[in-house]
Design a protein with these regions (language model features):
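Terminal, low-structured helical/coil segments at or just beyond the last alpha-helical repeat
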Residues: 22-25, 161, 167-203
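Canonical tetratricopeptide repeat
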Residues: 47, 79-82, 86, 120, ...
Length: 203
């Protein structure tokens, strides 16, 4: 539940060169054409994987991201690290958190120091019940990007699940203060959790 609450990250493919391709091509078709022109180019494979990810074609996305990693064993331009991060995102979307954790850790090991990696790793760890470790990664996401408001919600969920009610309340309040006032399902869910925790504290 906690992992699913945070797994609404929007992933976008990097812009590419349209060249002489028809204007009505989908992003997948455009990226597929690029791979046909350069099948051993890891960047083309990465971008095709991202296009498949956007289209929610997860099996195809995984295949292309794995191929991007294989084609770039030296992690030139940090492409293998990026591919591992996005592979982890695909695995997390498929509820394969244990494998996602491995992919996110590999992205970090390869030097992809981005708040999104730490946030996603925190989400995967939370879904596996590894709350103390998740808390470390959510905090790192906030250190790298203080505007990563989802990390406050993640911290709240991890603290709540580990029985640290006061800390959970603080993080939920920070989250709600940081996000725009909307009727978003995630915001409503956090408001409800916060209200229940405050009620529980009064008992």
């Amino acid at each position: 539940m906690a992992g699913m609450l945070l797994c609404g990250m929007v992933l976008t493919a990097q812009p590419g060169e349209a060249g002489s391709l028809p204007a009505d091509m989908s992003p997948v078709e455009e990226r597929l054409a690029a791979v046909r022109r350069a099948p051993t180019d890891p960047r083309a494979r990465l971008e095709l994987g991202l296009a498949y990810l956007q289209a929610e074609e997860y099996d195809f996305a995984m295949a292309e991201l794995v191929e991007a990693i294989k084609l770039n064993p030296d992690n030139k331009d940090n492409l293998a690290a990026q591919a591992n991060y996005h592979l982890g995102s695909v695995l997390l979307a498929l509820d394969r958190a244990a494998l996602a954790i491995n992919a996110f850790r590999e992205a970090l090991k390869l030097g992809w120091e981005d708040s999104g990696v730490y946030l996603s790793l925190g989400q995967a760890l939370t879904s596996q019940g590894k709350f103390d470790e998740a808390i470390i990664h959510y905090r790192e996401a906030l250190r790298l990007s203080p505007g990563a408001t989802e990390a406050y919600a993640g911290l709240g969920l991890a603290y709540e699940a580990s029985g640290r009610v006061d800390e959970a309340v603080t993080q939920y309040e920070r989250y709600l203060q940081s996000v725009p006032a909307t009727d978003d399902h995630g915001v409503d869910a956090i408001r409800q959790r916060l209200a229940k925790l405050k009620e529980r504290r009064r008992m």
